[in-house]
Regions:
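Bacterial N-terminal signal peptides that target proteins for export
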Residues: 1-9
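N-terminal signal peptide c-region/cleavage motif recognized by signal peptidases
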Residues: 15-17
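N-terminal accessory beta-strand-rich subdomains and adjacent acidic, glycine-rich linkers
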Residues: 22-259
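Short, flexible loop/turn elements at secondary-structure junctions
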Residues: 108-110, 121-123, 151, 240, ...
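A generic structural motif
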Residues: 134-136, 280, 382
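An acidic-aromatic substrate-binding cleft motif
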Residues: 230-298, 302
Length: 425
């Protein structure tokens, strides 16, 4: 009996030491070292080229329960991916996808639930996300992900997509900063905080912590609701000695999205486009001739071709000119222009405001395909909430089913979805 008790006690000590040990994930080239710890609270840190670029920072999420305090690492499983893939278009003919991965299973004191922290370390940067298994209802009310930067770090702050950038210290911000956020570190390095695969989540921005200096908090636009299995977007940290190198490594966002879901992509052809402003048949044909001469690939009819874009009664299945833009309501024979453009090797893109998209999307897609247009420009899409984020990405999928490319107007920031659905230009 005494021997059994001794062995049992020793086994408990071994198990405890394994669970309490920090989990480290390094990039294939060894430049990045990402460490996750559960010393009372779940936290992480990140070294790049042996310099600490993210100091110990909080991890956690509030979903049905507060998963911040009392979190412990249960198990971890490592893997490695090394492959190449060919994008439909882009800066490279072949994209390298090489990373070390770790699935870290987490438990909470007093709870039978489990959560997984997925970590990937690439040579271009490190990414992590929260993942939920099982089939239960999820209500995510807060994401506790923090980024504590070295003292003296400066940030290229911008409130939203169409506001100026200002180089600011990590203190005294008047408002939140949009993502991605470029940082100038005190020892001459640069870092970028970005995100990928934001397809069924809310918009998040950065705000300064009132309690911890030089710390950025994740600010959610609203709550997220779904049914597990489910995962949050990837949170990304990219580092470099020069800011241009971070831009050159932007394939990382694509690599953090699933493979292409479109079997035949031959119809997806990027190119230069010019807007037709007269909304007339003559103007459309003249612009086609100009496009041929100037080696452009597309012409574009913007707001007004189907009526006043902000009037919900405007019908995007008809060519009904907005008198604010052209008083001669029968001035545009759209089908004639499309046929003429096609004979010249030029594609036609049509603008549709979200008001009409929301009401008529399933009706207009097969119709536009029959008209022979090349794509749609989504106008003034709403961004921020989970509902509208999901709607937009589902709309891109539907366009792919009808062989239509998509250009999105307004404050939508792409997060790599064009790898999965490359009809999103």
């Amino acid at each position: 009996m005494k021997k059994r008790l001794t062995l049992t006690f020793w086994g408990m000590l071994v198990a405890f030491s394994v669970m309490a040990e920090a989990v480290k994930v390094t990039s294939p080239d060894g430049e990045y070292e990402f460490t996750v710890s559960d010393d009372g609270q779940l936290s992480y840190s990140l070294f790049y080229q042996q310099k600490e670029v993210i100091e110990p920072s909080r991890l956690g999420i509030e979903w049905n329960e507060n998963w911040y305090d009392g979190i412990r690492i249960v198990t971890s499983r490592n893997s490695r991916i090394d492959k190449n893939w060919k994008p439909v278009y882009g800066e490279r003919a072949v994209v390298k996808e090489l990373y070390n991965a770790c699935e870290i299973e987490l438990a909470k004191t007093g709870s039978r639930k489990r959560m997984v922290l997925d970590v990937r370390a690439y040579n271009e940067g490190v990414a992590f996300r929260y993942r939920f298994v099982g089939g239960e209802y999820l209500k995510i009310e807060n994401e506790f992900t923090q980024f504590t930067l070295p003292k003296g770090t400066l940030a290229w702050h911008t409130e939203r997509a169409q506001t100026p950038y200002n180089l600011l210290p990590l203190e005294g911000w008047e408002n939140e900063s949009d993502r991605p956020l470029m940082l100038q570190l005190p020892e001459g390095q640069y870092a970028c905080l970005a995100e990928a695969q934001v397809v069924d989540y809310v918009r998040t921005k950065f705000k300064l912590s009132d309690e911890k200096p030089y710390t950025l908090l994740t600010s959610m636009y609203g709550i997220v609701e779904d049914i597990a299995p489910y995962h949050t977007p990837w949170r990304i940290v990219m580092c470099a000695s020069r800011p241009g190198d971070i831009l050159a490594n932007n394939d990382l966002l694509l690599n953090l999205n699933p493979d292409c879901k479109i079997a035949d992509t031959s119809w997806i052809k990027p190119g230069k486009v010019m807007r037709e402003v007269t909304l007339t048949t003559e103007g459309g044909k003249a612009l086609v001739d100009f496009a041929v001469k100037r080696r452009l690939q597309y012409i574009h009819f913007d707001a007004g071709w189907y009526g006043f874009e902000y009037d919900k009664s405007s019908d995007a299945t008809t060519v009904t000119l907005d008198p604010r833009r052209n008083e001669q309501i029968d001035a545009l024979n759209l089908q004639e222009v499309i046929s003429y453009a096609k004979s010249k090797g030029i594609g036609v893109i049509l603008y549709v405001n979200q008001r009409a998209l929301q009401q008529q999307l399933d009706e207009i897609l097969p119709l536009y395909k029959s008209w022979g247009i090349a794509g749609i420009k989504f106008g003034f899409v709403q961004v921020g909430s989970q509902i509208w984020t999901r709607w937009m990405h589902e709309a891109v999928k539907k366009c792919a089913q009808h062989g239509l490319m998509v250009d999105i107007h307004d404050e939508c920031r792409p997060t790599g979805f064009s790898r999965t659905y490359p009809n999103l230009m």
